[in-house]
Amino acid sequence: MAILKSALVGFICFLHFFIVNASDNKSLLTEDIMASQVCNGMFAKKGKTSEITLKIDSYTSDFGGAIRLLIFNWKDVNAIGMEDDDGEKHYICNYEDIEAGVCKDDDYGLYLINQTAPHDSIYSAAVDAESMVSPLKYPVEQSGLYCVFTAPLEGSSEAYKITVTWENYFGNLDATDYPHLFLNPILLAINCLIGIWWSFIMFRYRHDLLQVQKYISGVVALSIVCTMVSTGYFYFANSKGYTTGSKVFAFFLSLAQSARQSYFGFLLLIVSLGYSIVVPSLGSLLRKCQILAGLQFVSSCFFLSSLFISPSNKESLVILFAAPVFLITLFAMFLWIVLALNNTIRDLRIRKQTVKAQMYTRLWIVICFGIVAYASIVAANAILIGIYGQMNYYLKYWKLLWFLNYGYTDILVLILMLTILYLWRPTENNRRFAMSEQVAQDVDEFEMTSSLSNDSLHLHHERPTSPANPHIIHGSADEHQALFAVDDESDDDASTLATSKQKPA
């Protein structure tokens, strides 16, 4: 059970890699050695105020002691600690160090600072928690990675809780989320331009639209809504902080992201099954696709909303329940898409429908490119963490985390969506190629989760154009555009369309 729980938590952390949500700009420190230190990026700007605020929430001590405190920019880390005559480095002044001459009586209990080493950001002091009425403020004058180290002055006799607030000059967002304020509006503008372009060609060829193209319009609309809500969320969180209003905003953002992700997967699935292009109707298979997408949407909503509202609570029961369901549905949909697309391409090639096979081959290339591109950034992160270690990786690349964690993924998804829209865009050839006798008569032959037998391939083949049969279309320059074989207005009249005759071009 413990292994399963660890695996689920690990999977949640992996999903957290590409989930776009804001990190709280507050950290909680306690006397526990594993929770007494924290580091975070900070941005500074001339004429603007950035500061680190420490507020003691609770404190208990048997001896009325104090809390040793150290705040510094990581670039000055080499100045922390003093070496004795044997070259051994000491970080906290104790009685042995005083006797050895490493530090003075006034330094007892404090973090030691090498005054001969260059530094300009280190603050070391013993804080009397009981007399500390107002929060301690540390001014940030240079952009960098800042750390706050604490420890009980009297050891295990003291217990405390300290809230550290990282207040950047631009607002309440964490430093790693700051690029959202620029990236999201750009993505929103691009998605709106894509929406205008798609609406124009949909209106231009409104009499030749296929049902699958109407489904594609839903992806465009959801992308605009998702980027709009995401932009509003981060601007609201930056302005108002992580309040109840921010959590409500985050909940709607989780709904939008879940809807876009599930719908996009559903669209890829029905396209891979040949809907509107190879077969006029999916029959009961369409309902199965909708059920799978619905399960993924519900589990994703629970999962994302829990992470948005409580980002630090990765082991809650809701997350531990929703994560495996989300994983199963995500894997099932991906596997189904791959199998369906592979079988569709194979069937089209067997039937010598080269133009359609080329369209689906291009879609396969786009999907493979997306998988390889995303896997590359995940692998690059894993390699860098393996080389530098998690802490040093963060210390070295914290300014690039916005790109590695979400910027790269957002840009990649936008490119993939735009490519698929271009391949499946409406054209004047929709009606022309609608009745080309390339439609399979048996929908069950496209149950892509099962193997295709040779006996199931006795379908209509494309025939070359001849004077005796001018109604059959074969090979033209227009075939290299985005071609659609079926003008499918609905599943109900699909069989009628499949048996209709095409007018001479």
Swiss-Prot record:
Q: Where are the transmembrane segments?
A: 181-201, 216-236, 266-286, 291-311, 318-338, 365-385, 400-420
Identify its membrane topology class. Multi-pass membrane protein
Sugar-bearing residues?
25, 114, 342, 454
UniProt keyword annotations, A-Z:
Glycoprotein, Membrane, Signal, Transmembrane, Transmembrane helix
> Which processes are annotated in GO (biological process)?
retrograde transport, endosome to Golgi
**Location of this chain's protein in the cell:** Membrane
Q: Which domain of life is it from?
A: Eukaryota
Q: Name one GO cellular component term.
A: cytosol
- Per the UniProt entry, the signal peptide is 1-22
Entry similarity comment: Belongs to the LU7TM family.
In Swiss-Prot or TrEMBL terms, this protein is called Uncharacterized protein C26H5.07c
| Organism lineage string | Eukaryota, Fungi, Dikarya, Ascomycota, Taphrinomycotina
